[in-house]
Amino acid sequence: METVIATTGLAMMVGLSGIGSAIGLSMAGSSVLGMIKKKPEAFGSALVLSGLPATQGLYGFVAFILYSGDVKTGITMFHAAVVFGAGLAVGLVCFISAIQQANVCSSGIQAIGGGHDAFGKTMILAAFPEFYAILSLVAAILMKGLL
């Protein structure tokens, strides 16, 4: 049972963060496609902004790598609970922050398409939801110290 709980935690780390990144990337990418109709020369800036939600999936994968070696048969319930908790924290925070970051990036991309100089401002604002994804990864790293 403990192995199942821990493996579920691993699955949440990589699964939820990856799903959030995929949703975020498609949201921001759709905004780029709308923007290039109006201002095709701004594709490079919009491309950078549309790729930002991908990082949450990477954080989930890093957490997965950190914990995957600890999950084996015969682990304790406490050990399994730590892995599950870390998976829940990283998975959910990265899932939500990727989508919310995509909202910020999409708005910035639309502003760039409207002729506004919004690239730098959008990068700054997009860093706010990113911070919480990083914080969840740091928390998972610190939780690993409990094992």
Language-model regions, residue ranges each:
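Hydrophobic, small-residue-rich transmembrane alpha-helices and their short perimembrane loops
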Residues: 1-147
